[in-house]
Amino acid sequence: MDQDIEPMKFSVLIAVYAKETPAHLAQSLESIFHQELPPDEVVLVEDGPLTAELDAVVSRFKEAHEELHIVRLPQNQGLGLALKEGLTHCHYDIVARMDSDDISKPQRFSREMTWLETHPETDVVGCWTDEFADESGKVISTRRLPENHEALLPFSRYRNPMNHPTVMFRKAAVERAGSYRHRELFEDYDLWVRMLQQGARFHNLQESLLMFRLSPQLYSRRGGRHYIRQEIAFQCWMHKVGHINGLRLVANITVRTLIRLLPEGMRKYGYLFFLRRQ
């Protein structure tokens, strides 16, 4: 970024709930406040009451960083509604997302802001993620996504086009599409589809700028009848609004349902092979 030009101010939006691990939240917040391009404000949504240990982490960072603003929801509402509320408290048009257990690399905000400043036609920019599963931080895989809008639009008809915790977006474009809403398990994908239908443009930087924590429950959560029901409902909605045609609907549901029904040990490989390829 040109040192002679003052970058646009921006917010970071993050949500946390009672089941988060306090040490993971602390690592996430540390990575936010130690960026090459630090945020002008961080909006942390407490999605329902937190544990005493999580409260202690939040209080420690609040004392150290006056730019940290806390939004407390009296009851857990789920990620979509928590982010919807949090976005209304973001004062700047550029907003970076962050999850409460991931780690942003120091150059992430700088790289994404540079892209948005030099490409005013882009509404959402993201990047790849390096995935890790334990405290050693050893990378076990990289989640790569297509780069430009022309590739991401068709890609979005069968795969989520963005790594949600990596994105930086223009708040006005998100609000034009109706902002976040409750769509269990698919809050971000749902928003991207609505934005695409509004004409928003997307881009992925072709580098990993975030460490994505793979929880031990990742693949167990992505199976079972409840997940299948949510998956089918989301795919049917994409068909209803015209984002996918009937053949794509059948193909998407068939592949995803088969993978969700696999035993947990096999589901990991089905997920990586079918649902993670570019």
Explain the meaning of each model-derived region.
Residues 19-34:
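Short, well-formed alpha-helical segments that are part of the catalytic scaffolds
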Residues 73-90, 111:
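Glycine-rich, basic loop-to-helix element that forms the pyrophosphate-binding segment
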Residues 95:
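Short aromatic/hydrophobic "clamp" motif used to bind/position activated sugar donors
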Residues 107-139:
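Conserved donor NDP-sugar-binding/catalytic core segment of glycosyltransferases
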Residues 128, 202-209:
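Catalytic beta-strand/loop signature of glycosyltransferases that borders the donor
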Residues 185-191:
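Acidic donor-binding loop at a coil-to-helix junction in glycosyltransferase catalytic cores
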Residues 200, 212, 220-244:
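Catalytic core of nucleotide-sugar-dependent glycosyltransferases
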